[in-house]
């Protein structure tokens, strides 16, 4: 599908989509502040005489009967989120709590005025509302689900209860590259390992202090970029400490690394108590180790650096049992890619991230983030991390579970969606999956028998003031969505 003339002349069927998006842009909708936009959607449905339900966290479900002659077609759920990430340039005076978001069109693109635009996922929501108004649109029984707080934890999707929304097929409109179809996402959980923090006075003869920092790593998102096999600062530092231990007597005084559960740690720091006569030799060993690790990670992390500094001699250090459990656990724990998908090329199926190591008052806590698009593999790796803790005699707790959206290869929905797309467009459909959590994964938990797929218009630089949406792709995706609704069997 190709477009000629000025951009707005080519926006024919999606003209109403852009009008609704502009209306939505007048209403503040930062994550956690969605009542206004939720009420707008409720009133939109009421004005059309449709059945509408709003829950306590402002999720909205709208129900529309099938078009005449389509009563026996599969029931369809359209789904998108109504909150947005609110970020602005440093010199912008924009107040997201009250100021409208600008819709500026330049060439084939729409952007805001030095703020995020909110096309993620406002454009998908606008498409859903435009469809409600279109009495010429043919479709089976249809429900529209608008969720809240997607950007800060998917709270809206978490809150959806069994029976709140039902359908044979679910079309999520939150994929951000035209012609891409997402068919699977990872589920996940956290394992919190808690090592008793036993301290003791520094031993006689340990009269010098050293700080070792592993830094200069790229880090990155522990789902999207785990396939890069980048260095994990927590594990690199642990490997370094273990090797020093094998040659010199040391006491560990502190260890910390990582800041977020979903980020590959890019920095970790340990402070040691050592004998002054060993300092020079330990520094020589560290210089050698640095070169070894720089070689190991020369492609993934060329900036890897060890920073070694003299520090005051620690007066209090970890007891030997604490040090032993900490180093052994992190050294032996799986980190990075555990397995890859056999169904989708280049997709990481299961991974592990030793995300954070930090001291609490009575424990050293290791936070591990595990992801998988296969529930059985997720269970295996989670139990493996728990059993390792048990073998070392330390506590481990599993928290924060969310389900995977497992790939349903050859599903009737995927087959029809891809076939129609390839009939309509010169560019072939790109079927992919993501090694991160999506709302579809959570919704699959309450809709286990619903077939799902995700697509949407091209959005560049979401979550930044440079966010922009490609208007020809809005037209294309909307035309495709209308055709798909009419054709689904």
Predicted regions and their residues:
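His/Asp/Glu-rich mid-to-C-terminal helical/loop segments that flank catalytic regions of hydrolases
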Residues: 163, 230-247, 276-279, 325-329, ...
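Active-site-adjacent substrate-binding region
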Residues: 225-227, 232-255, 395, 407-450
